[in-house]
Amino acid sequence: MFSNLIVGASASYLGDSLFVLVVFIILVALVGKFAFGPVSKMMQERSNKITNDLDSAAQSREDAAKLAAQRATELKSSKSEAVEIVNTAKQNGEKQREGMVTLAQEEVQTLKQNAKKDIEQSRLDALNSARDDVAQLSIEIASKLIKKELSVTDQKSLINSYIEGLDKQNETR
């Protein structure tokens, strides 16, 4: 009885195992047909997306590096332009300063020449005034001394000869 139980159990075990095996194979086939395709498609899409994201990130990194290099070049260029602008401004300022100095020197020379002319004119005016005053004074003194009036022509010739004598004395000094 006990042996029948073991033989019966083994047959039932074999039948159950066979049934489970068939159901498992059917389940694997169904899962493979209905689930494995979409899952593997999803995994492939995910793999493609990750690859595209990595490629995109690499491209973005390259673009950023190019942009950084371009910005660095532009910065160097703008620095050199700024230096050039400053140098040009310095040169223009120096030229303007030199022009102003030259103009000021010319104005000083003109003022000196005008001052010399004014001084010479004042000296001549003073000499003429002194001649007239000396002549008038001489005439008054002479007329008082002589008690006689001289003619205008005689007065002028007397004065001119006296002044010429004074000029000659000033020149010899």
From Swiss-Prot:
Its main location: membrane. Keywords: ATP synthesis, Cell membrane, CF(0), Hydrogen ion transport, Ion transport, Membrane, Transmembrane, Transmembrane helix, Transport. It is a single-pass membrane protein. GO terms for molecular function: proton-transporting ATP synthase activity, rotational mechanism; proton-transporting ATPase activity, rotational mechanism. One of its GO terms (cellular component) is plasma membrane. It comes from the Bacteria. It is found in: Cell membrane. F-type ATPases have 2 components, F(1) - the catalytic core - and F(0) - the membrane proton channel. F(1) has five subunits: alpha(3), beta(3), gamma(1), delta(1), epsilon(1). F(0) has three main subunits: a(1), b(2) and c(10-14). The alpha and beta chains form an alternating ring which encloses part of the gamma chain. F(1) is attached to F(0) by a central stalk formed by the gamma and epsilon chains, while a peripheral stalk is formed by the delta and b chains. F(1)F(0) ATP synthase produces ATP from ADP in the presence of a proton or sodium gradient. F-type ATPases consist of two structural domains, F(1) containing the extramembraneous catalytic core and F(0) containing the membrane proton channel, linked together by a central stalk and a peripheral stalk. During catalysis, ATP synthesis in the catalytic domain of F(1) is coupled via a rotary mechanism of the central stalk subunits to proton translocation. This is ATP synthase subunit b. It comes from Latilactobacillus sakei subsp. sakei (strain 23K). The lineage of its organism: Bacteria, Bacillati, Bacillota, Bacilli, Lactobacillales.
